[in-house]
Amino acid sequence: MNLFDQFSTFTKNLSNLGQGKLIALAVAGVVAIGFVLGAGIYVNRPSFETLYVGLERSDVTQISIALAEANVDFEVGTDGGSIQVPVGMTGKARLLLAERGLPSSANAGYELFDNVGSLGLTSFMQEVTRVRALEGEIARTIQQISGIAAARVHIVMPERGSFRKAEQTPTASVMIRASATVGRSAASSIRHLVASSVPGLDVDDVTVLDSTGQLLASGDDPSNSALNQSLGVVQNVQSDLEKKIDNALAPFLGMDNFRTSVTARLNTDAQQIQETVFDPESRVERSTRVIKEEQKSSQQQPDNAATVQQNVPQAAPRGGAGQQSSDEAEKKEEQTNYEINSKTIATVKNSYSIERLSIAVVVNRGRLAAMAGEPADQAKIDAYLQEMQKIVSSAAGIDPGRGDVVTLNAMDFVETQLLDQAVPGPGIMEMLTRNLGGIINALAFVAVAFLVVWFGMRPLARQLGFGGQAGKLEGEAAGLELPDFSPAGAGAGGALMEGFGSDFGFDGGDDLLNLGDEAGFNRRVKEGPERRLARMVEISEERAAKILRKWAVDRAA
């Protein structure tokens, strides 16, 4: 039966149903289709989990826009302050929102003064409003730093009093929501920012911590000591040298074929040097002083002897000539003062100086053998090692004068066996565990669809004449029903008996179906159905088989 015949049969069956049955059939079809669609939508509806709760209206709006732009399904809670996303999308959604600094509830800043009336406002309220506004403005500025999602600032201003002995200083604390790396790197900048924004606030009086309660920076933090700062300088120098060596060797060796270790000994002592330099060539005569002294003296000694007569008063006798002596002295002192140019140099060194470097580089022997080619000659490998040692020395700035050491060896790497193997993917059980919810939903949907088709659509199709084999058998077996051989139907069924006999190869005058022979007819009617069926099979096996197939289809329906 072709498609046109099936369509004709379908329209004929519909016309035979009547208006009431057609309406019932249409309602049943609509209900079945709606049930299947509703079940499919409900079963495949993704389950949601909470992303954020207790959000403000502005945050909900911004988060909804961001999720919609990223094609992430979401639902807003009935309270208007919570957002839900599909299960498994929480981490992705939070990372996406963190990149945009959401949620970021607005901190009140200087706009607080716009809503405060001056009438009846006490000095205490003015001070509190000023501190709140300052905290909000500083928090807004901190949130502008890349990687910081939210921030809160608390400032304690000193109370003013006339009878206080010691002067109080302001203090501040800052809480940020950011990753550990960003928080630690930005802690020092945040401290200086807050200290510069509050009058009289010292950097050591600012404490910074993250949302997990971990202290990032404080005044008594041991990490701010001179020792830890020196260790940080050493680590930075070592990592910088390792990076330079990696950049020099990676292009032809590959990052997985060598390992570098640098040990640096630094001198981080602070030095203060002050020196004065004089220029003797630039002297200028400033003053001259000259002192002259002359001394003269003479002495004469008489030649008379000392007697008693010399003591008697009498005219003084003339003495004889004695010894004479004279002295002369002359002194001259000259002093000249000069002005000389001088230069005073004061040097303060807070940096570091490298005292010694020790560098160790281990290279994968397999990579060197591949570079040397076949056969792998040891001389070629040694030549490569010498060239790489020169490269390492130049990249690290090795100075043999200060005792720097570079050691470069070729070894067999164990990691190369692992690097050649692909990373195994998740197992079957792991995949089933991850997708268990989706599998259950799919199986439930298939089961519901099967039940609807089996108990609803299949009987309906059978009633309308669908099912190609059943319709074909019904068409072929039309007119093959067993005739009524009873006497009551003899008068009206003469033509039927005649047709039935002709179907099985008999004419109207055949004595087997002759209605005139009532005795023989009654005898055949009294025979059981098995006997009559056997006679029909004997007459025409093919047509009897068609009738049996039709009976089997009707019984199954």
From Swiss-Prot:
Keyword field: Bacterial flagellum, Cell inner membrane, Cell membrane, Membrane, Transmembrane, Transmembrane helix
Question: Where would one find the signal peptide in this protein?
Answer: none
**Carries keyword Transmembrane helix?**
yes
**Primary localization:** membrane
Transmembrane intervals: 23-43, 436-456
Swiss-Prot/TrEMBL GO biological process terms: bacterial-type flagellum-dependent cell motility
Show the InterPro entries listed in the entry.
Answer: AMP-bd_C_sf, Flag_M-ring_C, FlgMring_FliF, FliF_N_dom, YscJ/FliF
Segments carrying the region annotation (Disordered) are 279-337
GO CC annotations?
bacterial-type flagellum basal body, MS ring; plasma membrane
Q: List the GO molecular function terms.
A: cytoskeletal motor activity
Protein's membrane topology: Multi-pass membrane protein
Cellular localisation: Cell inner membrane; Bacterial flagellum basal body
Query: Locations of Polar residues compositional bias?
Result: 297-313
Give residue spans, biased composition: Basic and acidic residues.
280-296
Q: What does the UniProt record say this protein does? A: The M ring may be actively involved in energy transduction.
Instruction: Describe the protein's quaternary organization and the partners it interacts with.
Output: The basal body constitutes a major portion of the flagellar organelle and consists of five rings (E,L,P,S, and M) mounted on a central rod. The M ring is integral to the inner membrane of the cell and may be connected to the flagellar rod via the S ring. The S (supramembrane ring) lies just distal to the M ring. The L and P rings lie in the outer membrane and the periplasmic space, respectively.
Concerning its family, UniProt says: Belongs to the FliF family.
Q: What is this protein called?
A: Flagellar M-ring protein
Q: Which organism is it from?
A: Rhizobium meliloti (strain 1021) (Ensifer meliloti)
Write the gene name: fliF
